[in-house]
């Protein structure tokens, strides 16, 4: 056994430095499984992290005896708390290194399914999640428990939706949409005003074809091929909905995603978007502020109110014919 710390990458079989590694590759050497990202409060894995979530020493009372520090970390939470209580009763002046149960990490093996150490495991075993069936809920971290529960329910809901969508066929090509050859074709094209299923490729080809001369675009291309109801846009989705509420949620998520993408026609204020206020994409100028939508209302001779698009001076001057 050497004095070096065991390489954490070697433990997981992923060290790329080999013999040139400055850490030890001897499994008998002491490991250092403390998560440095957690100490900086930037660990993104939470309870799923494979390393120990222990706060930095500056945030905790310092111990005068390094041996007691090692002993407190290596013992189980329940055993450590019991030792702490005994020390406090026997010697009021002793300086005990105290760690709140919230700081103990849960066992990654138990969280994944089964811990080979059982009751001898030095880590805390989490509570059972009723959704995923894993013991991954930390008993003393309510925020993590709530976050995991919501995320787990969301994943389970998505899996159930995928199962229900397996047998849905396209109303045009009559193929099962989720059984198509390429991943890009395995998407539904949802129409906002009807519930007929289409694959995204078929409905887009239908709406992009050239209209017959003299026929209205809305009645020929933007209408559903089956029921002829008019839908102004198509929503791509990897699952098929089972209720109007689920359909509305899919459409809202799609619109919210488009609102985060800059409109190529608006071009940060240098272009002109033909869709105007109806555009789903973000109309933002180069300095970051959003375009202020101002609708122009014009009254006709028949008493009707018409909303007109904004007219630029360059477009007006470009349309003049000077003889």
Curated annotation (Swiss-Prot):
Residues 129-158 are annotated as: Makorin-type Cys-His. A zinc finger (C3H1-type) spans 1-28, 29-56, 101-128, 257-286. Residues 62-92 are annotated as: Disordered. Keywords: DNA-binding, Metal-binding, Repeat, Transferase, Ubl conjugation pathway, Zinc, Zinc-finger. The keyword Membrane does not apply. GO terms for molecular function: DNA binding; ubiquitin protein ligase activity; zinc ion binding. E3 ubiquitin ligase catalyzing the covalent attachment of ubiquitin moieties onto substrate proteins. Residues 62-74 have a biased composition (Low complexity). CDD domains: RING-HC_MKRN (cd16521). It comes from Arabidopsis thaliana (Mouse-ear cress). Gene3D superfamilies: Pneumovirus matrix protein 2 (M2), zinc-binding domain, Zinc finger, CCCH-type, Zinc/RING finger domain, C3HC4 (zinc finger). Pathway: Protein modification; protein ubiquitination. It is an enzyme of class 2 (transferase). A zinc finger (RING-type) spans 170-228. This is E3 ubiquitin-protein ligase makorin. It catalyses: S-ubiquitinyl-[E2 ubiquitin-conjugating enzyme]-L-cysteine + [acceptor protein]-L-lysine = [E2 ubiquitin-conjugating enzyme]-L-cysteine + N(6)-ubiquitinyl-[acceptor protein]-L-lysine.
